[in-house]
Design a protein with these regions (language model features):
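Basic, amphipathic alpha-helical segments enriched in Lys/Arg and hydrophobic/aromatic residues
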Residues: 255-258, 345-433, 438-442, 446-451, ...
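Secondary-structure capping and boundary motifs in well-ordered enzyme cores
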Residues: 37, 59-67, 82, 106-109, ...
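DNA-recognition alpha helix
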Residues: 85-99
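Helix-centered, glycine/charged polyanion-binding patches within enzymatic domains
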Residues: 297-377, 381
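Polybasic low-complexity intrinsically disordered regions
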Residues: 64, 91, 100-105, 109-308, ...
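Function-dense linear segments that define catalytic or interfacial modules
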Residues: 40-44, 51, 79, 237-242, ...
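Basic, short loop/linker segments at the boundary and entry of helix-turn-helix/winged-helix-like folds
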Residues: 26-73, 78
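Hydrophobic alpha-helical membrane-insertion signals
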Residues: 1-33
Length: 466
């Protein structure tokens, strides 16, 4: 029989701290906390963020930036897309409260605090926090900086195509289309005819003509599934030897991939030098690997002049080399040789493995494929943090064999299956050996009229018979 739980007539006025409920210790977040403590994350972050806070000693103290970063970590590892969801999850979970060092009687930060802290901390502070994780990776041999891969993906902006306005006339999109239809002799009230007219109208999605007033930085472009939407373009530079992200930034959705590629690669080299404690002009990068979207002859020249090998396929198969300058011909030929070589093909395979994996973890499993933030700066800050947390997961995988909560759960299931298989193998071996012993024993005792001994558990020496 069970006891029916009744609603309390009057809540308790005083509750002893010893009577408060406690949660079982979260294995993942305890390991994450150990990882952060291993390279002094909290003290270094506070030292980085000190210039952003006033030191007058008056007024209400601000929220610890370490708490803010840990809450964003929770959103990354648990695929929470919005800051409201992150704040609700942190307030609801006792294990996450322990990770944040918050007691049950303390109120966790509200989602509105995220906006204030994000605006308070400049982009340079986020860059230094990202470099802090590179220091930790370097200390554990997870950052080499010789072979780099670069690629971009798509983030769907928190903006709608319906809200587009014309840059010159400030007309809404459909009002503008109806006016053009009327000028071409089409009834503007006929929705089918107007849509057909708009469908066949050239240059209708030009970013030079249209802007979203709620997020002017978002651009019209194609999403991953081919649909037209307002987008941003995140880009990651990855160490192809270890999978660590050495640079992460967000570009406008209409920017070409190859634009200033050489400059961005050299900026990634600066991050590697800072993590390794080397001089700024030290060059460790040997190769740069990417897809056809990053192919530009001038960019190839710039990288090859720095003695960096370019493994980037030419999108034009029958490129007319006789129209190029001698130096350009040399750069194109060198890139072709690199792509066709055995080492180049290996680098292209590693580029697909490491870069696509990083985008899957950050965008699809990290909650920012469809962003809830607006503005290039806000999104760039969030993407840098997500890349830093991805590097933390790489470090956790090195130290503890797990990098995400889902991987920890999968390891438990895998361990159970392995133990089950091991027990099955042991049982089969025991069964074979015991069957042979039983047959010998049965033949020896048959004259004493002892029969029916068919299992090993019934033999002398087994007290439980199990």
């Amino acid at each position: 029989m069970f006891e029916k739980k009744q609603k309390a007539a009057q809540p308790e006025f005083w509750v002893a701290a010893q009577q408060l409920p406690t949660s079982p210790k979260s294995t993942f977040y305890s390991k994450l906390d150990e990882t952060l403590e291993s390279f002094g994350f909290a003290a270094k972050v506070r030292a980085i963020c000190v210039p952003a806070y006033k030191q007058t000693g008056t007024g209400r103290p601000g929220i610890d930036p370490v708490v803010y970063l840990k809450m964003i970590m929770v959103g990354f590892f648990e695929d929470l897309p919005s800051e409201r969801a992150i704040a609700a999850r942190c307030a609801d979970s006792m294990s996450i409260r322990a990770f944040l060092n918050y007691e049950l009687d303390e109120k966790t930060p509200d989602h509105s605090s995220f906006t204030i802290i994000r605006q308070r901390l400049g982009l340079d502070i986020y860059e230094r926090i990202f470099t802090l994780t590179l220091h930790a990776l370097r200390a554990h041999g997870l950052l080499r900086g010789k072979h780099l891969g670069i690629d971009s993906s798509v983030i769907e902006a928190n903006a709608s195509l319906r809200a587009l306005v014309h840059r010159n006339t400030e007309e809404q999109y459909w009002d503008y289309v109806k006016r053009l239809a009327a000028e071409n002799g089409i009834d503007p009230e006929d929705a089918v005819a107007v849509r057909k007219f708009d469908r066949h109208r050239p240059g209708k999605g030009s970013n030079q003509e249209w802007v979203n007033p709620y997020d002017p930085d978002a651009k019209i472009g194609r999403t991953k599934d081919g649909a037209t939407d307002m987008i941003y373009k995140p880009e990651a530079v990855v160490d192809l030897d270890t999978g660590a992200i050495v640079q992460a930034q967000v570009h406008p959705g209409d920017q070409a991939d190859h634009k200033e590629m050489a400059t961005r690669v050299l900026d990634a080299q600066q991050n590697i030098n800072q993590a390794a404690g080397e001089e700024r002009d030290t060059l460790t990068v040997k190769t740069v690997t990417s897809d056809k979207g990053y192919y530009a002859v001038n960019e190839l020249q710039a990288l090859q002049q720095e003695e960096i090998r370019t493994v980037i396929a030419d999108p034009i198969a029958n490129r007319r080399l006789h129209k190029l300058e001698p130096n350009q011909k040399k750069a194109v030929a060198a890139a072709r040789r690199s792509v066709r070589s055995k080492s180049g093909k290996d680098l292209l395979r590693r580029r697909g493995m490491h870069i696509e994996r990083s985008f899957a973890h950050i965008l699809d499993c990290g909650g920012i494929r469809r962003t809830t933030l607006r503005g290039w700066e806000n999104l760039n800050k969030r993407f840098k943090l997500a890349a830093a947390f991805y590097n933390l997961s790489q470090l956790m995988r090195k130290l503890f064999g797990i990098g995400t909560p889902k991987q920890l759960a999968a390891c438990g299931r895998l361990l159970f299956l392995q133990l089950t298989y091991l027990l099955a193998v042991i049982a089969r071996i025991v069964h074979r050996n015991s069957s042979a012993r039983i047959r010998i024993w049965y033949v020896g005792l048959k004259d004493r009229h002892i029969s029916g001994l068919t299992t090993f558990g019934e033999l002398p020496g087994s007290s439980t018979g199990c």
